[in-house]
Amino acid sequence: MDVIGCIFLALSIIAFAVVIGFAITWLVGFVKKSKGASSVGKTGTIISGSITLAFLLIGIGFLGIFAYQQNKKEQEFMAVSEKFQKEYDATIFSLDNKNNAVDEAWSYYLFSDDDSTPIDATDVADSFSITEMDNHFDKLDSYIEELKQNDTGELKLSYHYYKRAYNKLDGYRNLTYHPVAKGYLGFVEKSSNYSNSVENYSKKIKRFNDGKL
């Protein structure tokens, strides 16, 4: 719609040049007292002036509608961004707790001198609710789609940033729910990297939502 508005504004500029041409003809005819030239100039000025005004008003109208739609999308984007951040933080909190539980069980299993039977880290991971985490990610999925639909490209964060934040959180989930594939030291290192990364994503989104970015 902004393209259409710009086209009509461009046409109004061209038409205005025609108006000037007819106005000059009208003026020359008036000065030289040439009724023919004066009549043509006057008629042409009126017609081309009307066309110019019409093009100008249509162009402004289209640009006004486009600006309104863009503003509405940006407001919706901001509203969804706040929902995304709230759900993102809740998911981080849940994953941090689960990840810490795996870490504690695994480190105890490897390094404790306690004679009691240790709890295997995989048993801890297997005890986590898949449904709970799926619910978190389903909500984030829906927010991602809404952000994509309302992304004007004019705000300081785009849909793509939220998608990267989501992907990083999904990696954290996979590590926490399937920890043994990396070995304990790999698990600890990866966990720290994921935890720091998702926390940084969350902080930047919060600054954006607070208007401080």
Regions found by a protein language model. Give the residues of each.
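C-terminal amphipathic alpha-helix
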Residues: 77-127, 161-213
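Membrane-embedded alpha-helical segments of integral membrane proteins
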Residues: 1-33
